[in-house]
UniProtKB/Swiss-Prot annotation:
Stated family: Belongs to the universal ribosomal protein uL6 family.
One cellular-component annotation, GO: cytosolic large ribosomal subunit
Domain of life: Bacteria
PROSITE patterns named among the record's database cross-references: RIBOSOMAL_L6_1
Chain's role: This protein binds to the 23S rRNA, and is important in its secondary structure. It is located near the subunit interface in the base of the L7/L12 stalk, and near the tRNA binding site of the peptidyltransferase center.
Name of the featured protein: Large ribosomal subunit protein uL6
An example Gene Ontology biological process: cytoplasmic translation
Quaternary assembly: Part of the 50S ribosomal subunit.
Signal peptide span: none
Gene: rplF
An example molecular function term from Gene Ontology annotations: structural constituent of ribosome
Disulphide-bonded residues: none
């Protein structure tokens, strides 16, 4: 039995929730998110709370209910506060700059790299070595950050590359002669 699914999700003021079968739409100040859930999950709205439970006779229904509850909680946080990921570029000549709806990156390749941003994700470059991504969908913001990081993941010897601001890159010792 999922302990996560047993806790209800509180709906703060200013957030609108629409339930349509297994589809849930949450609208808030930062945007609107829609998601369809597994049909083994029963979602009910009571006053300012959403409750989750399993449908009878469905295998792994408690696990699905716990997953649904966690996803809905992230949707509520996303439309009220939003999510932020910060990337830091480390290396000689590594730079980032905004180019319209894309992030332009100079990463030591023979060509500049441009990463197009999907709808719902905004980026800003407070300095040439920082990228701040914001959006209301946690999964999309995290995926864009991972895609940008994958162009030049931090290497373990000098630590050059793109890393998350809170990431700790373990460094290796150089080979001895």
């Amino acid at each position: 039995m999922s302990r996560v699914a047993k806790a209800p999700v509180a709906i703060p003021a200013g957030v609108e929730v629409k339930l349509n079968g297994q589809e849930i739409t949450i609208k808030g100040a930062k945007g609107e998110l829609t998601r369809v859930f597994h049909n083994g999950v029963v979602i009910a709205q009571e006053d300012n709370q959403l409750t989750f439970g399993p449908r009878e006779g469905v295998a792994n229904a408690w696990a699905q209910a716990g997953t649904a509850r966690a996803l809905v909680k992230n949707m509520v946080v996303g439309v009220t506060e939003g999510f932020t990921k910060k990337l830091v570029l480390k290396g000689v000549g590594y730079r980032a700059a905004m180019k319209g709806n894309a992030v332009g990156l100079t990463l030591g390749f023979s060509h500049p790299v441009e990463h197009e941003l999907p709808a719902g994700v905004k980026a800003e470059c407070p300095s040439q070595t920082e990228i701040v991504l914001t959006g209301c969908d946690k999964q999309v913001v995290g995926q864009v950050a991972a895609d940008i990081r994958s162009y030049r993941a931090p290497e373990p010897y000098k630590g050059k590359g793109i890393r998350y601001a809170d990431e700790n890159v373990r460094s290796k010792e150089a080979k001895k002669k």
